[in-house]
Amino acid sequence: MSEMTPREIVHELDTHIIGQHDAKRSVAIALRNRWRRMQLDVDFRQEVTPKNILMIGPTGVGKTEIARRLAKLAKAPFIKVEATKFTEVGYVGKEVEQIIRDLTDSAIKMTREDQMKKCKFKAEEAAEERILDALLPKPKEDWDNEKPDDSATRQIFRKKLREGQLDDKEIEIDVAAPQVGIEIMSPPGMEEMTNQLQSMFQNMGPGDSKRRKMPIKEAYKLMIEEEAAKLVNQDDMKEQAIELVEQHGIVFLDEIDKICKRGESSGPDVSREGVQRDLLPLVEGCTVNTKHGMVKTDHILFIASGAFQMSKPSDLIPELQGRLPIRVELSALTADDFKRILTEPHASLTEQHVAMMGTEDVKIEFTEDGIESIAQAAWQVNERTENIGARRLHTVMERLMEDLSYDASDKSGNTFVIDAEYVSSHLDDLVQDEDLSRFIL
């Protein structure tokens, strides 16, 4: 789990996301509170529940990007889901409990990788011995002898193997046969039963090994994975993963505004209000049955986000509103924000285009006034048509760089300067013509 302070988390988010300081502070405090809670006494720790967050802001201002970056910083089980993918229990579509099952699967993967790293040294030793056995098979009379072979020849081959002199030599080895993939069409709401059936059929399949011929370099990597997998205790791994989910799990619910009930309508609303009702026990705290064991959701942190352009947060059912106590509003982006987005973040849009053209030996230089013109053009199109936030910059940049990208292979060694005049000549007609802006930008 991450031990970064809120200030460090905000600083890390600042390298990728421009503005939205309030939202960054809220998620940073929430992430730090996960660590603070774990420092408390076990009895008192159970009483401290996470304060879930609702992020409100127009599209393209950084809500989803904050979630993506937070996932990398958290070093904890994290899953991002679209609220629109789920329906009420009993109807066609995914049940909300699938969120916790997917979160548990990601924790299992994380724990397995962590345990395999810990036993990597032993796995490398075992893989080395298997390769040497394939290169120097024991005499028939020594097959039952368990003593390690420390002959001079074996040591010479061991030295060559470690120095990489045998990498290209082909050997024939026994590797675990791949599991047979069995696809089962699941009835609505029965995904968990389907998963269990798939696991059962796969375990019934042939568990023996298969003889394959491959270069030593490739065989060594494969054997390390096999040996590491043998050293991992599956029961301990599952226990650790479930503990990790229950104490540190984070769920990011995107597009929650799309499941608000709009206006007065009669009849069941299975993909909106029904989903909200099903989310209540998850957010409040319940026990979900997964194929790895029972998972309690009492201390899982939920971060919900939505644009709320066609609805408002008060359109959520009151019970769900009460379970999202921290509200953060993200502001719409200005032309100055666009200018900063083009230059300040790590691997910014301008840096990406310079690097891409550099592969063709074409040098691109963006001037200060050129960047200002691009930012202004994107902002104007957003104001006149639909405001899609920073995503508009991608459209504008692709349109601006289209000619250069097409001719780059024929202009190797040349330098091109993207200044205000260049931007004006390529974008002015589209920006000024509202009809063209709607269809092209």
UniProtKB/Swiss-Prot annotation:
| Pfam families reported for this sequence | AAA, AAA_2
Name the SUPFAM superfamilies for this protein.
Answer: P-loop containing nucleoside triphosphate hydrolases
| Role noted for this protein | ATPase subunit of a proteasome-like degradation complex; this subunit has chaperone activity. The binding of ATP and its subsequent hydrolysis by HslU are essential for unfolding of protein substrates subsequently hydrolyzed by HslV. HslU recognizes the N-terminal part of its protein substrates and unfolds these before they are guided to HslV for hydrolysis.
Q: Which gene encodes it?
A: hslU
Whether Cell cycle counts among this entry's keywords is no
Enumerate the SMART domains for this protein.
AAA, ClpB_D2-small
Q: Which controlled-vocabulary keywords does the entry list?
A: ATP-binding, Chaperone, Cytoplasm, Nucleotide-binding, Stress response
**Could you tell me one molecular function GO term of this UniProt entry?**
peptidase activity
Give GO BP annotations, semicolon-separated. Answer: protein unfolding; proteolysis involved in protein catabolic process
Localization terms from the record: Cytoplasm
- Native source organism of the sequence: Shewanella sediminis (strain HAW-EB3)
Q: Which NCBIfam families match?
A: hslU (TIGR00390), PRK05201.1 (NF003544)
| Classification via PANTHER family | ATP-DEPENDENT CLP PROTEASE ATP-BINDING SUBUNIT CLPX-LIKE, MITOCHONDRIAL-RELATED, ATP-DEPENDENT PROTEASE ATPASE SUBUNIT HSLU
Residue positions binding ATP: I18, G60, V61, G62, K63, T64, E65, D254, E319, R391
Gene Ontology CC entries for this record: HslUV protease complex
Q: What is this protein called?
A: ATP-dependent protease ATPase subunit HslU
Q: Which domain of life is it from?
A: Bacteria
Task: Summarize the subunit comment.
Answer: A double ring-shaped homohexamer of HslV is capped on each side by a ring-shaped HslU homohexamer. The assembly of the HslU/HslV complex is dependent on binding of ATP.
Keyword Cytoplasm attached = yes
Read off the HAMAP family from this record: HslU (MF_00249)
The text of the family note is: Belongs to the ClpX chaperone family. HslU subfamily.
